[in-house]
Amino acid sequence: MQPLLTIQDLSAGYGGKTVIRDISLTLMPGEILGVVGESGSGKTTLLKAVSEVKGLRTDVYTGTVTFDGEDLLHMDAEEKRKCQGEEIAYVFQHPGDSLNPTRKVRVQFYETILAHRRMEKKEMDELIASVFKRIGLTDVERILNAYPFELSGGMAQRVVIALAVLLHPKLILADEPTSALDTTVQKQVLEELLMLRDTLHTAMIVITHNIGVARYLADRVAVLYKGGIVEMGKTKEVLENPQHPYTKSLMAAVPKLAYGMEKEA
């Protein structure tokens, strides 16, 4: 099986200042990679370099990003438009970064569909309903007829996830998708992401500073420190037997709770 995403010797930043350097990794179809590290380590910059989402652009100085056999960094405008949103979707930390507060939720789903496909209203409604059902969202009409600010934070984030998987993307880039949520809703969202991986074979890169989230969700973990990957491997191996001094210090800072559970500091 060929990798879905290959990043090779990637260095990127802003205004001539390098933030991430010499990043190399691969992501297989259906695999979840957790990227952990302290604030300022370059986690979000890595996603921005891959995403090409409007407003998230960063400057790539060296390296290549290959997605599904295509050179992601040198696609023309039409290829990028097709790829972003349909084959690669982005889940932001805060739902407000994804949802327009002046438009009802239903309209935003319609706009996403029509940006990539020609569909009648009935077909769109059926597609939306099927996605809501897949991730366990009930009371569909109430949600679709609401404005984003009328939804709770947890519900809004679940709507964002539904919007992200609407067109069955091959890759989801998630930037701290649960950090703004309470613990109960966090687990619910994580379970929904795992279910999407299992049912749709969607690959994901999940940025988090919460080791518990990485342990629960990721197949593999990459540890970022000062813009570079210092350790990467299977989640259990990296988190239970860290080799790099920074990874060891990161794990030592995680409070241990009863029953072997871990909680974000």
Where do the language-model regions lie?
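Conserved ABC ATPase signature
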Residues: 146-151, 155
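The feature captures the beta-strand-to-loop junction immediately N-terminal to the Walker
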Residues: 36-38
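A short, surface-exposed alpha-helical micro-motif characterized by mixed small hydrophobic
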Residues: 214-216
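A short, proline-enriched helix->beta-strand linker immediately N-terminal to the Walker B motif
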Residues: 166-170
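Conserved ABC transporter NBD signature motif
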Residues: 59-71
